[in-house]
A protein has these predicted regions:
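Residue-level detector of alpha-helix initiation sites
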Residues: 24, 194-195
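Active-site entrance/lid segments in N-terminal catalytic domains of soluble metabolic enzymes
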Residues: 1-183
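Conserved active-site-proximal phosphate/metal-binding subdomains
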Residues: 167-189, 195-330
């Protein structure tokens, strides 16, 4: 696959980005993706099994993972910077600010800013030589234009098909991507429902210059998600996922008893914060402990397309190879 603007920008071989996911995208996974030629990204609470309300400890947790990634790869990798912790138990700007400071101190190659208001961090990050991607929330044309004006290097557009929080607008990937591509000059990275080369070829035909995959990387050997989560993804069908509304947007997840209860809550008029208060404390119980009855199993609608646990390197290689074959054939 020929290198494009995104590859040149990030210094990577293939335009494949592993999406940062809460608790389960630690240094080992990020480094494996980067070593395979993509871009691995450390997520919030990476490598941890307990939550903290301490601002300083939050920063040090991130620092430990960055140092670990540096020991595992010499290739570019990234870290996630949340601009808002709307449902964080400690709340507030202080957590974002401390993670931002640690990122500057450690001098990593790439940052993926998630949330609204990225402009407050962009200049200092870029002045430090860090490439800045924005995973918009909200994710729409207006947000992409604002990100471009703020100096963001590339915009990550995740459609409603994705897992985790995808904003409130509920725009499907194949409607979202071409509209954003038409609206901005910076590279657009597509996410939401992409697990293989077919999806990669499709969004690149729509004008995207890279893919942003989360759910596919859950079902990898390097991901610390519980085996029950990976097995549930392998057994998923086209009707195995569900969405509910939280304060950070729509959440995509497997249709577990807990998530069905959230659907009932939403239908009966519960607020997004009340729903979040119900599912959020159960992330670890689901993703790390594998408790199907009581846990939250976050993933995208694409889960039904995944049939095998692979290494991160296999995922990168197979996605790129299949996309190349399809694009050559068209």
């Amino acid at each position: 696959m020929k290198k494009n603007r995104l590859c040149e920008l990030l210094g990577i071989e293939y335009p494949v980005i592993q999406a940062p996911m809460n608790w389960i995208t630690w240094a080992e996974l990020a480094a494996a993706v980067s070593n395979a030629g993509g871009l691995g990204v450390i997520g919030p609470n990476a490598g941890e099994r307990t939550e903290t309300k301490d601002v300083v400890e939050t920063g040090e947790r991130l620092r430990r993972q960055i140092k670990k990634a540096k020991s595992l790869t010499k290739k570019p990798f990234g870290a996630n910077l949340m601009t808002s912790f709307l449902d964080h138990p400690g709340g507030g700007e202080a957590f974002s600010r401390r993670c931002f400071e640690v990122i500057l101190e450690e001098g990593i190659p790439v940052v993926v800013i998630a949330g609204s208001g990225p402009e407050k961090y962009v200049k200092q990050l870029k002045d430090a030589g860090i490439k800045v991607l924005h995973r918009g929330m909200p994710v729409n044309v207006a947000a992409a234009k604002e990100a471009e004006q703020a100096g963001i290097d590339a915009f990550v557009a995740v459609g409603f098909d994705g897992g985790g929080h995808t904003g409130h607008d509920r725009i499907p990937t194949f409607v979202l991507i071409p509209q954003i591509v038409d609206a901005v000059r910076i590279p657009v990275v597509a996410g939401g429902g992409i697990v293989d080369g077919r999806g990669m070829a499709a969004v690149m035909a729509l004008g995207a210059e890279g893919v942003y995959m989360g759910t596919r990387f859950i079902a990898t050997t390097e991901c610390p998600a519980h085996q029950a989560v990976k097995q549930a993804i392998l057994e998923a069908t086209d009707t195995s996922t569900v969405t509910v509304t939280g304060p950070n947007g729509v959440l995509g997840a497997l249709k577990t008893p807990l998530m069905l209860r959230c659907v009932q809550m939403e239908g009966s008029g519960s607020t997004s914060q009340e729903i979040s208060n119900f599912y959020r404390p159960r992330y670890m119980k689901g993703m790390l402990e594998g408790n199907i009855a009581e846990g939250t199993f976050v993933c995208g609608a694409c889960a039904g397309l995944i049939k095998k646990v692979k290494s991160a390197a296999e995922v990168v290689r197979d996605v790129v190879k299949e996309a190349e074959q399809i694009l050559t054939r068209l």
